[in-house]
Design a protein with these regions (language model features):
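Short, well-structured N-terminal submotif of metal-dependent ribonuclease cores
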Residues: 1-40, 50-60, 125, 132
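Acidic, PIN/NYN-like endoribonuclease modules and their adjacent C-terminal/linker elements
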Residues: 3, 30, 104-134
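Short loop->beta-strand "edge-of-pocket" segments that line small-molecule binding or catalytic clefts
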Residues: 4, 37-39, 66-71, 113
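Histidine- and aromatic-rich ligand-binding microenvironments
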Residues: 6-7, 41, 96-97, 118-119
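Short, flexible loop segments at the rims of nucleotide/cofactor-binding pockets, characterized by
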Residues: 15-18, 47, 90-94
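Active-site-proximal, substrate-binding regions of enzyme catalytic domains
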Residues: 53-75
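Active-site neighborhoods of divalent-metal-dependent phosphate/nucleic-acid chemistry enzymes
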Residues: 68-113, 117
Length: 134
């Protein structure tokens, strides 16, 4: 089973019962969990944490038995930095690398697929990355 790194937007859709995306995100998570190992990293964890009052509540929503936690590889951090340079040279205005660069780079260097509902940036900066998206 090829692991799948889950983007925070999918998890937040489910956690917040997003009226537009929660049905798609819930179904995609369920389908992907049946056929793959679901992965999260510290950036995904941090982004999702804003919707929870305590770490215990977050850990209950993202149980380690369902979401394997993995640190960000240094190779992914390097690649994220290179993507950020490309972004800035292309006119991007952010002053530091975006979380999506770290998430996409992690999936890319680890050989994982990525489950997201916001595929455009990932496809731009990680064209070989296998993406599960609407």
């Amino acid at each position: 089973m090829t692991p799948v790194l889950v983007d925070s937007n999918v998890l937040l859709d489910v956690a917040t019962a997003d009226p537009v995306w929660s049905a798609w995100s819930s179904a995609a998570l369920e389908r992907t969990a049946d056929e793959s190992i679901l992965m999260i990293n510290p950036l995904v964890y941090a982004e999702v944490s804003v919707g929870f009052p305590t770490i215990e509540a977050l850990d209950e929503a993202l149980p380690a038995s369902l979401y394997r936690r993995e640190d960000l590889p240094y190779e992914a951090a390097f690649l994220a930095g290179k993507c950020f340079v490309r972004y800035r040279r292309g006119g991007g205005s952010k002053a530091s690398p975006l979380p999506d660069f770290y998430i996409g780079a992690h999936a890319a260097v680890a050989g994982y697929r990525l489950l997201t509902r916001d595929a455009a940036r990932y496809r731009t900066y990680f064209p070989k990355l296998l993406i599960i998206a609407p």
